């Protein structure tokens, strides 16, 4: 028996015994193919099965299924002979409520939001030109290689990259991520990226861990959450300081390319030159206006003011000189009067006679008969005897 023969027998057996089955579960991964067919995985708490719903059947469905939807399917089990892979072929589909993963996600999201862990007030700003950047992800992941390749392509050599290896899938992933986060947060980094590439809802569910969310919230380092694809949302996206839709988008957000920096510098130089020329032109206009102002307005006023000041000074000097002249004239009159008085006294004193007795000036009442005296005037003197 060949593999083809075995697969065909198994296909016939499955389609015979597993026909018209009702299957319930949660979508953990889905592809809406361009051909119109839908391919998805349906899971419960322990297992999953690949499912397909072809275009002819899904046209009757009134909604587009998504990851996390809890569905009830009708259909049969079949096997694809070329690969030997069996799958459930759905012929009808309806929603059966929230899946367990989605319910857990929404409940935790609502509780943390009420506590304020998503409040924009607590979001830290990202650095403009980071020099120390940490990346928490699996060191063997394609996402890490894509990020490092993009950094190299951007030729951003200002930053040193620190890689912190952690599990990004499975039950042990939250603890591994928390340990890596604590280690990175103690290294005084400028920014930290928590990254993982795309995957199923179940694959990404470790980033919905409550303990991880609280560690992200209390970290002192600004954190970017870059998990899955643009349509994927996890709790770490809401509690982080910034959400990037993909790991590569986180690099685009954080790092300028060499060309971007050169263009920014050129633009800054151009703006500075425009500002410089504008300032110079303003100052030139100001100087020109001031020159005109002083030339046609202020200078004549200043000259007139100085002339008025000189006239006032001249008047003050003339007044002072006139006062001094009057003072000198009065003083001269006093001297002249004093001179005339002395001259009159001198002329009168020529007629006066001085009496001396024994060489001393004597008064008339002191003289006695027979006293010998000397009589003197300004022109002569005589000896005389008192009778």
UniProtKB/Swiss-Prot annotation:
Compartments (UniProt record): Cytoplasm
Pfam family, one: Exonuc_VII_L
Gene Ontology CC entries for this record: cytoplasm; exodeoxyribonuclease VII complex
Catalytic activity line of the entry: Exonucleolytic cleavage in either 5'- to 3'- or 3'- to 5'-direction to yield nucleoside 5'-phosphates
Molecular function as annotated in GO: exodeoxyribonuclease VII activity; nucleic acid binding
Keywords, alphabetical: Cytoplasm, Exonuclease, Hydrolase, Nuclease
EC number(s) given by UniProt: 3.1.11.6
Biological processes, Gene Ontology terms: DNA catabolic process
Keyword Cytoplasm in record: yes
Family: Belongs to the XseA family.
Subunit structure comment from the entry: Heterooligomer composed of large and small subunits.
PANTHER family: EXODEOXYRIBONUCLEASE 7 LARGE SUBUNIT
Function: Bidirectionally degrades single-stranded DNA into large acid-insoluble oligonucleotides, which are then degraded further into small acid-soluble oligonucleotides.
Stated name of the protein: Exodeoxyribonuclease 7 large subunit
Source organism of the structure: Campylobacter jejuni subsp. jejuni serotype O:2 (strain ATCC 700819 / NCTC 11168)
Gene that produces this protein: xseA
């Amino acid at each position: 028996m060949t593999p083809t023969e075995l697969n065909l027998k198994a296909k016939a057996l499955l389609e015979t015994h597993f026909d018209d089955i009702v299957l319930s579960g949660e979508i953990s991964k889905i592809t809406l193919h361009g051909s119109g067919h839908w391919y998805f995985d349906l899971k419960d708490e322990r297992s999953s099965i690949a499912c397909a719903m072809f275009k002819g059947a899904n046209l009757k469905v009134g909604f587009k299924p998504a990851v996390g939807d809890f569905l009830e399917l009708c259909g049969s089990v079949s096997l694809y002979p070329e690969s030997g892979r069996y799958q459930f072929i759905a012929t009808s589909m309806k929603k059966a409520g929230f899946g367990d993963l989605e319910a857990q996600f929404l409940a935790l999201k609502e509780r943390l939001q009420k506590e304020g862990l998503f409040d924009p007030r607590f979001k830290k700003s990202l650095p403009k030109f980071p020099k120390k950047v940490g990346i928490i992800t699996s060191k063997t992941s394609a996402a890490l290689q894509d990020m490092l390749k993009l950094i190299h392509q951007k030729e951003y050599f200002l930053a040193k990259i620190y890689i912190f290896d952690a599990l990004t899938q499975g039950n042990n992933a939250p603890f591994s991520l928390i340990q890596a986060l604590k280690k990175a947060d103690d290294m005084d980094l400028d920014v930290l990226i928590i990254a993982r590439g795309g995957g199923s809802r179940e694959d990404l569910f470790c980033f919905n861990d409550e303990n991880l969310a609280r560690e992200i919230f209390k970290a002192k380092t600004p954190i970017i959450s870059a998990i899955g694809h643009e349509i994927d949302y996890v709790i770490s996206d809401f509690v982080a300081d910034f959400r990037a839709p993909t790991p590569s988008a986180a690099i685009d957000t954080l790092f300028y390319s060499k060309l971007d920096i050169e263009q920014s510098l050129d633009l800054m130089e151009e703006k500075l030159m425009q500002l410089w020329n504008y300032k110079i032109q303003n100052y030139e206009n100001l100087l020109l206006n001031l020159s005109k102002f002083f030339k046609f307005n202020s200078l004549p006023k200043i000259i007139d003011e100085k002339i008025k000041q000189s006239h006032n000074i001249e008047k003050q000097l003339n007044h002072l000189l006139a006062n001094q002249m009057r003072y000198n004239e009065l003083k001269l009159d006093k001297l002249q009067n004093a001179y005339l008085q002395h001259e009159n006294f001198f002329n009168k004193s020529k007629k006066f006679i001085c009496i001396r007795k024994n060489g001393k000036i004597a008064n008339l009442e002191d003289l006695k008969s027979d006293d010998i005296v000397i009589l003197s005037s300004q022109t002569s003197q005589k000896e005389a005897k008192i009778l």
